[in-house]
């Protein structure tokens, strides 16, 4: 199986400006993400940038750099521009890995690509079991429910499914495995072009979840439980310090 990894790496971030270039033990954050994409066995790794400073840093990493526009409203739109510039065949498997996840396990990059290759759905993603009550009721943790064949029924910031009887008890009782969606996607290149041609859907606007556009248009998304639970990405300076400490501990143990 052959697949391409595209890593969107925007320079601007409201919480952490210059995030792709943030130093983590002598390397920019984007370098750590690129290393994991290579370890996953991608046939090609492309970093989609919108700033020359990020492009310069990536050019030294031995992967492709694609300069993209600053007008995109979503990561998928940026991905579509990359697909157009590289003229990928419609059935090419594209894995979108976020540029702010320096600890992403290579195994789950390979897993989501393999899952797409073995399903009729045009898009695949992953989820992990929720084990913490705070996360279960946190709107920043996106929940997903699937049918018996592993296709998404719905993604929501709300707690789904709602365990009416279990949650009515004090303390709340869980009688179901709840799943948190993690933001890694695999697509067929042709489907990415189709996706960006659709208007924004009402559910997508309400939940602020772009994958709901796919379900709105009656297409399928394959969902599987991730082989490894990925550590959190980097959204804030505090997150960055946590990653630095984590990697520092690993280096000191070697």
UniProtKB/Swiss-Prot annotation:
Keyword terms of this UniProt record: Cytoplasm, Lipopolysaccharide biosynthesis, Nucleotidyltransferase, Transferase
EC class (word): transferase
Catalytic activity: 3-deoxy-alpha-D-manno-oct-2-ulosonate + CTP = CMP-3-deoxy-beta-D-manno-octulosonate + diphosphate
EC number: 2.7.7.38
One Pfam assignment: CTP_transf_3
Localization of this protein: Cytoplasm
GO MF terms, alphabetically ordered: 3-deoxy-manno-octulosonate cytidylyltransferase activity
Main location as per UniProt: cytoplasm
Any Gene Ontology CC annotation: cytosol
SUPFAM superfamilies noted in UniProt: Nucleotide-diphospho-sugar transferases
GO terms classed as biological process: CMP-keto-3-deoxy-D-manno-octulosonic acid biosynthetic process; lipopolysaccharide biosynthetic process
Pathway: Nucleotide-sugar biosynthesis; CMP-3-deoxy-D-manno-octulosonate biosynthesis; CMP-3-deoxy-D-manno-octulosonate from 3-deoxy-D-manno-octulosonate and CTP: step 1/1; Bacterial outer membrane biogenesis; lipopolysaccharide biosynthesis
Family annotation (InterPro entries): Cytidylyl_trans, KdsB, Nucleotide-diphossugar_trans
Similarity field: Belongs to the KdsB family.
Role played: Activates KDO (a required 8-carbon sugar) for incorporation into bacterial lipopolysaccharide in Gram-negative bacteria.
HAMAP family per record: KdsB
PANTHER family: 3-DEOXY-MANNO-OCTULOSONATE CYTIDYLYLTRANSFERASE, 3-DEOXY-MANNO-OCTULOSONATE CYTIDYLYLTRANSFERASE, MITOCHONDRIAL
Protein name per UniProt: 3-deoxy-manno-octulosonate cytidylyltransferase
Gene that specifies this protein: kdsB
């Amino acid at each position: 199986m052959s697949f391409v990894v595209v890593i969107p790496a925007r320079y601007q971030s409201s919480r952490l400006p210059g995030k792709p270039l943030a130093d983590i033990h002598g390397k920019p954050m984007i370098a750590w993400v690129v290393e994991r994409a290579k370890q996953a066995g991608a046939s090609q790794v492309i970093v989609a940038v919108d700033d020359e400073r990020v492009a310069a840093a990536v050019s030294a990493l031995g992967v492709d750099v694609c300069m993209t526009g600053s007008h995109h409203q979503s990561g998928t739109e940026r991905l579509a521009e990359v697909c157009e510039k590289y003229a990928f065949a419609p059935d090419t498997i594209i894995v979108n890995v976020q540029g702010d996840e320096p600890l992403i396990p290579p195994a789950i990059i390979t897993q989501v690509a393999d899952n797409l290759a073995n399903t009729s759905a045009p898009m695949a993603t992953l989820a992990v079991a929720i084990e913490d009550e705070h996360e279960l009721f946190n709107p920043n943790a996106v929940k997903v429910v699937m049918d018996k064949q592993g296709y998404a029924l719905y993604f929501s910031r709300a707690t789904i499914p709602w365990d009416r009887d279990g949650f009515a008890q004090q303390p709340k009782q869980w009688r179901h495995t709840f799943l948190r969606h993690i933001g890694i996607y695999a697509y067929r290149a042709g489907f990415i072009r189709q996706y960006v041609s659709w208007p924004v859907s009402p559910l997508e606007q309400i939940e602020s979840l772009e994958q709901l556009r796919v379900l709105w248009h009656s297409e399928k998304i394959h969902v599987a439980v991730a082989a490894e639970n990925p550590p959190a990405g980097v959204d804030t300076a505090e997150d960055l310090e946590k990653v630095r400490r984590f990697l520092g501990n690993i280096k000191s143990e070697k």
